[in-house]
From Swiss-Prot:
GO cellular component labels: cytosol
Molecular function as annotated in GO: 3,4-dihydroxy-2-butanone-4-phosphate synthase activity; GTP binding; GTP cyclohydrolase II activity; magnesium ion binding; manganese ion binding; zinc ion binding
Region (DHBP synthase): 1-203
Binding site for D-ribulose 5-phosphate: R30, E31, D35, R142, A143, G144, H145, T146, E166
Region entry GTP cyclohydrolase II, spans: 204-414
Gene3D superfamilies in UniProt: DHBP synthase, GTP cyclohydrolase II
Protein's name according to its UniProt entry: Riboflavin biosynthesis protein RibBA
Organism annotation: Clostridium novyi (strain NT)
PANTHER family noted in UniProt: 3,4-DIHYDROXY-2-BUTANONE 4-PHOSPHATE SYNTHASE, GTP CYCLOHYDROLASE II-RELATED
Summary of the function given for this chain in its UniProt record: Catalyzes the conversion of D-ribulose 5-phosphate to formate and 3,4-dihydroxy-2-butanone 4-phosphate. Catalyzes the conversion of GTP to 2,5-diamino-6-ribosylamino-4(3H)-pyrimidinone 5'-phosphate (DARP), formate and pyrophosphate.
Residues that, per the record, bind GTP: R254, V255, H256, S257, E258, Q275, E297, G298, R299, T319, T354, K359
Length: 414
């Protein structure tokens, strides 16, 4: 979808706020569809008629779980076998409607459902409007049109409920991105992607919560340890802080991903444990800095999957191909949470200890200024040379290998 020009999320929010519709596109590996979408409280008979005439799909009303409970709207089926887990409830009509199917009466049902004080007795079941339950956490938990509708309405400062309708071509086939680009031009609509909405939310909202702190004497020096909880995933991360890091001056920072095998068990397959030790020594030496210990084991795939990847590496694969063979990208880590922790710590400018350019761009993309990349290169050994070579050759890590003349592909990880 990169070759197409999409609107910004800010533009979409403004149109939603003003009662307009926008087209929202999901991932091409998901439904690969576009929906007309607007805020439920802004719905009019004209809008419903437009959806029915020019979108041609099923008109639905995404809502929060809390609102659905207030209206006593239970799930349509107990065992949801839909591959995308679309959470339909029983359909409804307002008790003030006749047949409930006209554009006027469908608009009435929607606006009545989002009114403050609306009660279950105000609606008859079944009906012609199909409420959908949005997941808590919105598009950050499920990248669907249901969640996008609630998120966009919320971001626009409106009631967290939307109205959506899938867009079909005139011949009845589903409209894909090339069709949708022509569609928005004809109807003068904005078009955005759920992927961009996810990125927007990650950059503009905070999902971490400080849970506690204490002093932590270590063999590397004295630190303050601060615990954080990721409210979306429930994962717990920690920051080890040395000295005053809030005075606006650039701070020496290491964002370190958890590696049980390297950090705790002393594995020679990687350089993680040595990098952790070197970073803490360097921060302590400078007297000012922080190390973030992020619970993103195995570049985000988790400990068990990392062990499975090790087995594939034992059989000749490198670390990248092993991840791909297990169905994962080469790197699943989310640097946004680390950036949010840095903001909570009062850090604005960073001297980042890393060999990974993607980590630099990943953190700077969240509003943290990276003033310097500080190398943290560890001397390799026979057990991890192939792994480190792979990081350099295939993942773009900046490694010098001063002791080694050439890349010997015959060297495998232990």
């Amino acid at each position: 979808m990169e070759q197409f020009k999409f609107n910004t999320i800010e533009e979409a929010i403004e149109d939603i706020k003003n009662g307009k519709m926008v087209v929202v596109v999901d991932d091409e590996d998901r439904e690969n569809e576009g929906d007309l979408l607007m805020a439920a409280e802004k719905v009019t008979p004209e809008a419903i008629n437009f959806m029915a005439k020019y979108a041609r799909g099923l008109i639905c009303m995404p809502m929060t779980e809390e609102k659905l409970k207030e209206l006593d709207l239970y799930q349509m089926v107990i065992n949801n076998t839909d591959t995308k887990e679309t959470a339909f409830t029983v359909s409804i009509d307002s008790v003030e409607t006749t047949t409930g199917i006209s554009a006027f009466e469908r608009a009435l049902t929607i606006t009545k459902a989002v009114e403050k004080g609306a009660k279950a007795k105000d609606f008859q079941r079944p009906g012609h409007i199909f409420p959908l339950r949005a997941r808590k956490g919105g598009v950050l938990k499920r990248a669907g049109h249901t969640e996008a509708a609630v998120d966009l309405a919320t971001l626009a400062g409106l009631t967290p409920a939307g109205t959506i309708c899938e867009i079909m071509n005139e011949d009845g086939t589903m409209a894909r991105v090339p069709d949708l680009m022509k569609y928005v031009k004809v109807h003068n609509l904005k078009i955005v992607t759920i992927a961009d909405l996810i990125e927007y939310r990650r950059k503009t909202e905070s999902f971490i919560e400080r849970q506690g702190s204490a002093s932590l004497p270590t063999k590397y020096g004295e630190f303050e340890i601060i615990g954080y909880e990721d409210k979306l995933t429930g994962k717990e991360h920690v920051a080890l802080v040395k000295g005053d890091i809030k005075n606006g001056e650039p701070v020496l920072i290491r964002v370190h991903s958890e590696c049980l095998t390297g950090d705790v068990l002393g594995s020679l397959r990687c350089d993680c444990g040595d990098q952790l030790a070197q970073a803490l020594r360097q921060i302590n030496k400078e007297g000012r800095g922080a190390l973030l210990y992020m619970r993103q084991e195995g570049r985000g795939i988790g400990l068990i999957n990392k062990i499975k990847a090790y087995k594939l590496q034992d059989n000749g694969m490198d670390t990248v191909d092993a991840n791909l063979a297990l169905g994962f990208p080469e790197d699943l880590r989310d640097y946004g949470i680390g950036a949010q922790i840095l903001k909570d710590l009062g850090v604005e400018k960073v001297r980042l200890m890393t060999n990974n350019p993607k980590k630099v761009s990943g953190i700077s993309g969240y509003g943290i200024e990276i003033v310097e990349r500080v190398p943290i290169e560890i001397e390799c050994n026979k057990k991890n040379e192939f792994y480190l070579r792979t990081k350099k050759e295939r993942m773009g890590h900046i490694l010098n290998f001063k002791n080694i003349k050439k890349y010997d592909k015959s060297i495998k990880e232990a």
